């Protein structure tokens, strides 16, 4: 199933165990820009569960944490097809203490939303040692009840709840109560309790050199009526409170969502955005003034979504993204230090053996000076979705 642009985007776009190496193909297609594929790994797979939308952080002690969404594999229960909205979708976590060679077999529960399913846990390792994880949710209501809600975003009988954040101060073993961010300025989507939905996003926020957190969120506002756009929120207290800063991207035709943010050595904030109504092209917007404003968005010149940008030891940037067109898989580019060569950077095929377009959503971390791990969700032959990874050698 192809994830609808509004189904994460939530409301914005519908509208749109022990492990081992499992695949060594495509090695001849890597090696570009000093990046070489070593092997693919299965990080977590259970045929009873649909596992998807991971993120990864490397703790100061070297431990790796992978968070992901897990829901029942509904096809095993006799239901038709799969869905990205499920009342039993929870946020889970697995660990590795040996640089990804083995992973904990029994996943730990991060959070179960009391009002519905939880989505896309997006972790960031903060400099104070804590981990901040953003997510969002959907509530399942009876169809007649959902239909009565004013200005709600619906996906069938599901109603969008908006976003929230979770914090752990002990390496992901325990998580504090949810932090509810404010609605985006001008938000027109209301939740089931009659209030504008809290800010939300699927993608990486970043901690700037100034210590502040920068978070690009998706929103359906009155800025461009009916069109999802993106906006910047900033936190000066490690994510406890957030202030609206400025619009990031809006357009009368193109919708934007699922944004990952990256700060370059010169302090430029680069927003890598998923699009709809734009032939699946990546869009990019830049802020040259520490998030006070963004220049007009631009076409990056290639297809793929969503994205994660990882700084390499030499300060170049590894940009990874899902590829939901035949051949389905995971791709990457190595950008210069200021991310200025988007269109000209050679595309690196990490995987092209996916069973359908329902895959991707990669995240990455460095393991050492010359090794990186990219994690994502994957399927073979349209089988049960699982969390996989690709180990890279970096020259």
Regions found by a protein language model. Name each.
Residues 22-26:
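Sec/Tat signal peptide C-region and signal peptidase I cleavage site
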């Amino acid at each position: 199933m192809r994830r609808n642009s509004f189904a994460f985007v939530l409301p914005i776009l519908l509208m749109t165990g022990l492990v081992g190496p499992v695949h060594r193909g495509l090695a001849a297609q890597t090696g570009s820009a000093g990046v070489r594929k070593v092997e693919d790994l299965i990080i977590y797979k259970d045929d009873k569960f649909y596992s998807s939308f991971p993120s990864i952080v490397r703790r100061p002690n070297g431990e790796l944490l992978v968070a992901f969404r897990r829901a029942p594999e509904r096809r095993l229960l006799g239901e038709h097809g799969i869905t990205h909205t499920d009342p039993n979708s929870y946020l889970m976590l697995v660990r590795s203490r040996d640089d990804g060679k083995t992973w904990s077999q029994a996943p730990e529960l991060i959070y179960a939303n009391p009002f519905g399913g939880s989505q896309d846990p997006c972790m960031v390792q903060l400099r104070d040692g804590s981990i901040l994880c953003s997510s969002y949710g959907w509530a399942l209501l009876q169809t007649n009840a959902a239909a009565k809600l004013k200005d709600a975003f619906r996906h069938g009988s599901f109603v969008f709840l908006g976003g929230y954040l979770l914090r752990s101060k002990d390496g992901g073993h325990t998580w504090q109560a949810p932090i509810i961010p404010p609605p985006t300025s001008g938000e027109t989507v209301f939740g089931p309790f009659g209030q504008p939905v809290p800010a939300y996003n699927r993608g990486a926020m970043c901690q700037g050199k100034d210590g502040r957190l920068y978070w690009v969120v998706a929103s359906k506002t009155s800025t461009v009526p009916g069109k999802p756009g993106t906006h910047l929120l900033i936190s000066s207290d490690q994510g406890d409170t957030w202030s609206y800063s400025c619009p990031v991207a809006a357009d009368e035709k193109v919708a934007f969502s699922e944004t990952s943010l990256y700060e370059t050595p010169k302090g430029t904030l680069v927003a890598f955005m998923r699009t709809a109504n734009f032939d699946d092209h990546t869009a990019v917007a830049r802020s040259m003034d520490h998030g006070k404003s963004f220049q007009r968005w631009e076409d990056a010149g290639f297809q793929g979504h969503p994205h994660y940008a990882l700084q390499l030891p030499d300060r170049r940037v590894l940009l990874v993204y899902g590829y939901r067109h035949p051949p389905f898989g995971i791709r990457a580019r190595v950008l210069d230090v200021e991310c200025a060569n988007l269109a000209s950077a050679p595309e690196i095929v990490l995987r092209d053996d996916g069973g359908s377009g329902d895959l991707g959503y990669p995240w990455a971390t460095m393991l050492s000076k010359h090794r990186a791990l990219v994690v994502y969700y994957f399927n073979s032959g349209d089988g049960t979705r699982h969390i996989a990874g690709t180990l890279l050698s970096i020259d």
